[in-house]
Amino acid sequence: MIVLTGASGGIGLEIIEELSKLDDVLAIYNTSKPKDVALKNVSFHKVDISDPDEIKNFIDQESSNLKDVTLINLAAVSIDGLLANYGIEDWEKVMSINLSSNFLFSRYLIPIMIKDKWGRIIHVSSTNSAIGAGAYSSSKSGLEGLSKALSREYARYNITSNIIKLGVFDTGMFHKLSDKNKKTFLDLVPSKKLGKTSNILNAIDFLINSEFVNGASITIDGGSS
C-alpha cells in the first residue's frame, strides 16, 4: 500500500497513475480533490495535514487496510517573503505542512511497518534555496535530520527512510511561471532540459525495492545544484 500526501499538487497528480501500477494508493489531498481522476487502485482522502489530530484519526481509520506500507511525503507549501518580514503564522504553516506532517505520518505508520517487518518512507524535498523562500528551504533542510533519525532508529525492522531532492520539472507549476522565471530556472540546468515525472518514479521504484539504501538523499535535478 502506498500512502501519498500532496495528491492534488502538480507532481502528485502526474505520478498517481504510475504509482497505482505498483500498488494500491491512498492519495491524500489538503484542499480540493483532483478533478477527472478516476483510477481503479486509487482512493482519495481529504486530510488537513497541518492538524495532528486529523492525521492520527485518518491513520486509525485506515489501519486495518494498511500493509507493507510505502509512505511518500510529497505535500509542501511555500509562502514567499524575506524572513525578517515573516509572521509567525506563516512560518508555522510552512513548517507544519512541510516538516511536521512528515514526522506525524511517519510516527503513526511506523507501528504498522514494525508489525509487518517492512516499510519504506520517502520524503520529497527540493534543491530550491532561492531568496524569498527561506521558510521553505528551512523546512526542507529539517527533513535531512528527520530522515537520518528514522533510518537509524528503525532499520532493524526493515524500514528505510530516504529523501528525493528535486530540481525543475515539467509540471503544471513550472508552466505557470513567467517566461523570465522559466528561463532563469532552465539556465541553471546544464542540459537546458526539464525533469520528467518518469525520473521521479524511477527513483521511487528504486527506493521501494532497495533494502540497503537507507538514510540517503538522492538528488534529481539534471546537475543544476
State each model region's role.
Residues 111, 152-156:
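Alpha-helical segment proximal to the catalytic Tyr-Lys
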Residues 82-83, 90-95, 174, 185:
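Substrate-binding pocket helix/loop in short-chain dehydrogenase/reductase
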Residues 155-160, 213-216:
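Short, small/polar-rich loop/turn modules that mediate ligand/substrate recognition or access, typified
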Residues 8, 16:
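N-terminal Rossmann NAD(P)H-binding glycine-rich loop of SDR-like oxidoreductase domains
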Residues 193-220:
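C-terminal substrate-recognition "lid" of short-chain dehydrogenase/reductases
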Residues 106, 139-142, 147:
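Active-site helix of classical SDR
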Residues 74-80, 223:
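Conserved NAD(P)H cofactor-binding loop of Rossmann-fold oxidoreductase domains
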